[in-house]
C-alpha cells in the first residue's frame, strides 16, 4: 500500500474524529488514533484489527509522559480533537471545575499544538494542524459557560496562531474546526454532569432539572443525527494541499449562530 499522509488524531475514540479517521484510512493514509484511557485503547484496537494502516495509542493530553508521543511519532497532519465539557452555572460551580475546562480545552490543546508544530518544523515538512473548537463559543448557553468560554478562548488563539504562521511564511498551516451540535453523546454527558459539579448549597442547584430539560429538548431538536457529511468534509480538507483556515459546520447551525451574533448579542 502506498501511504499518502500520516495523520495523528487526539480524542479519536469515537464520534466525529473516529468516523473521519475511517474515511482517511479508506484513502490509503496512515492514521494514529489516540485515546484518553488504556481501556479505550484496547477496545479501539479490536475495532481496527483489520486495518494495517492504523495504529492506536493512549494519549491523555494531561499526561506528560503520553505527550512525548507527539515528539517521536512521524506525521505530517495533526488534529487536536480532545476536549471536555463540565457543566454547571458559572456562579454555582467551583473555580477548580472552571479551571479544569480551561486546562484541557485551552492550555493542553495549545501544549499539543506547540509540540506538533515543533515536530513538523524540525522535519521541515509542509505540515497541517487542525484544531477542534465549537460554534457554542459564540453562545451564552446556560450552565455551560465554563465549556463555551473555554472554546471561545481556543478559537481566539487559533485566529492569532494562523496570523503568526503566515507572518513568518511557515510551511505549516493551521485550520480551525468549529463544530455545531452532532449526536455523538458528548452533549448529553455535558448536559447531565452539571449535578456533579454544582454545589448543593447553591441556589443554581435548584434550577438544574429545569435547565437540563430545556437543553435536552434543544439538542434533540438541533443535533445532526448522522456523521457521514461532516466526516467526509473534514477528510477532504485534510487531504488538500492548502486546506482553508476556518471550517464551520453544519451549515444551518452556522447560519443561526451568525444571525444570533448580528441581532441578539
Please report, for each region that a protein language model flagged, where it lies by residue.
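Substrate-binding pocket helix/loop in short-chain dehydrogenase/reductase
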Residues: 89-90, 97-99
